[in-house]
Amino acid sequence: PIYYQPASIVLAQAKAMGYAPTFFGVDGMDGILTMEGFDPSLAEGLMLLTPFSATVPETQSFVEAYTAANDGVTPNQFAADAYDGVYIVKEALEKAGCTADMSSADICEALVAQMTQISYSGLTGKDMTWNAEGQVSKAPTAYVIKDGEYVLPEA
């Protein structure tokens, strides 16, 4: 995947060269609009898949708390993934019966075994599960950047 920092360079170079295709990316590009020094107009029409939206009702409590604690910055999927990650690990620790007196190796072993057994619903997905390789099952949503905002694509 390409993340938003290198993607910003690609978009700037494309504009400088007069190259104007429809760019498509994934969740690694979420955050490009708030990157310091980036001209958001360069991302106009960019399509991306991301598991998080700061504009849907289900995330508003998190968005308001995050924005208040971070000088008005709106969270992107990286912030939401981190938030979910803490609670996913907490759930796995509890279900595995981990305690503070366990060795780190024993905790890791218990977590690996437990991760394929849990299902978690959070900011970035509903009923998320993990396979033995650690891959998560969650459905992203398609967005288009229009006028500096993430919007659902028109049918």
Identify the meaning behind each predicted range.
Residues 1-155:
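Extracytosolic ligand-binding ectodomains
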